[in-house]
Amino acid sequence: MSNGLIHASGLKKSYKIGPNDVEVLHGIDMDIENGEFVSIMGQSGSGKTTLMNLIGMLDRPTGGSILIDGDDITTISRKEMVDYRRRTVGFVFQQFHLIPSLTAYENVALPLVFAGDKGHSAALDALERVELSHRLDHKPSELSGGEQQRVAIARALVMSPKILLADEPTGALDKETGERIISLLNSLKDDMTVVMITHNHDLARMSDRIINLQDGKIKE
């Protein structure tokens, strides 16, 4: 068995569509090491988002296993999975999903509030990591698209996750701003593993490694 932070073995996922079971992932074997920045690429329907949902514990596989830092997350209860996900994984999406009425600081601090942590010093630290501490009192409408995505990244960092999952994080940004966001993600890998879904080959080449999916399998 690999000592990788993320270890998938024989990973399968199928969905019930009418009377039929449609398999989306067909026995994925994959290792991602601690401190890696990995891009997952593939055509629409190749299984990229399904794979990320399984790694991020937003869904369960129908076969195989996933180990995160040696813990088999496919065998734990749903309640345990929610708690493990909250402590282990941060998410960044194409859309920023910031609350318009809250400041940058308040948006970043939200996960801490839900976790019952009222200290919030971690929110300031996260904003500093994305170089936005000078904009902490600004609301989303007062920030550029790139700044809003930085706030979203800071929010994903605030619980100190082991894994950062980014699903098309530059899709709503122009080329230059997108490259700056990827450079920022690359700078985070000293403290965590970064896994990104992207259709952009140029941005994917900025990561350490590319995993190509085709028809629910890893393309060698």
Range-by-range predicted roles:
Residues M1-N3:
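Short, Lys/Arg-enriched, disordered terminal segments
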Residues I210-E220:
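H-loop (His-switch) and adjacent beta-strand-loop-beta switch element
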Residues L5-I210:
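ABC family nucleotide-binding domain
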